[in-house]
Amino acid sequence: MMKEYMRLESDSIGAMEVPKDAYYGVQALRAKENFPITGTKIHPVFIKNLAKIKRAAAITNKKAGRLKPEIANVIEAAANEVICGMFDKDFIVDGIQGGAGTSANMNMNEVIANRAIEMLAGKKGDYTIVHPNDHVNMAQSTNDVIPTAGKLTVIDLLKPLGKSLSLLTQALYDKAEEFDHIVKIGRTQLEDAVPMRLGQTFHSYATMISRDRNRLLKVATEMYTVNMGATAIGTAINTSPFYFDNIVPILRKITGYPLTQADDLFDATENLDGFVHVSSCLKICAVNLSKMCNDLRILASGPKAGFGEITLPAMQNGSSIMPGKVNPVIPEVVSQVAFHIIGHDTTITMAAEAGQMELNAFEPVIFYNLFDSITTLTHAVNTLTTNCILGITANEKRCNELLDASVGITTALCPYIGYQKAASLAKESLKTLVPVKTLVLRYNLLNKEELDSILDPYSMTEFIPHTQVKAI
């Protein structure tokens, strides 16, 4: 005997009891039981975008004369409520699921249908009033609504990432200006190289992150091309001519994005290289951030027995056994996020490669990982900017000490005394610990005025076209 707080629903597999007050139906519940995979539900931004597509479809089908106005109006109203987040708890399907996203699509169709039924004074589950497939999913397929919702979600999620990268870039440029007067020794392969300004180090980081941001802004525009109207494989089966021509313009108006219908709907339905491209751009950004964080950890190492050229903000105790130890936890967590995103990129790449024939069934795992990559990277950039970059200070005295102790300045002397003499000075300095400057003056290779001019910070660290070099 069925319990009073349950209702009976049926699909092509059979009958199943569904909680009476639930807006989801039998197909969503069956999917929940089939896919207890991650414990993480469909991304909430994806839910909102899928609801926007349902709203656009209802409007288009009503204008096409295929959906009765009274049915279309309640579907549109229910979709708006979903967009506002009123039924988030009724989206019960796991983020990773079999079926190319059919379970997510049907979860949405059932929630909208049952809410629309309520609006028409019916009881949930009475699909003779509003049907999940016949009405809510009219002229659609999982194979066009799911990838389109995925693209809209990528666009939405990339916006805050772009803003976060802008703030990080500006913070790095500010530090570049703040530290521009400080000369330090540059390093290649972790060995002393030639002098540079600490500001140049941070300026290079800012340039790199700005490039990452521009790359992501550009790849986001690729998401504007959608396959709505393709239905199952690209033939537009079960659509009306009006729907086919107008679904994208109506969705464009609802979203505010300059969406266009793909020229080749077969290609747009079966090939997911666009998502791989987005993921690769995220990976590049993550790699660059991690490289920068590696540098920051090295430059801040110490505080007494390391490089110690900069100091990172102290955020928390660094050890449960060593008193006073403070670790570079923010750069460390950003690097871990980078490893995480690189792993996601591999998953996305393999999932895109694994599609067969006219459809790729692995969009759920692509979206699960892609959305997480964007969101996690955004959070990492925010904490890096706020809790690290803005609070970095320079240790100018330490930079000068290491610069003076280094033989790297001998490179600046090569045009004036020759490579061989400069190399001999470097070797002698390393052996005797006598500074290179002292040796130059001791052997009368240059006078003090000439030496000071050559070793001027800007002479050493900037290309100055009018600099005159004597013949040697």
Language-model features: where?
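Conserved, well-structured ligand/cofactor-binding cores
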Residues: 1-472
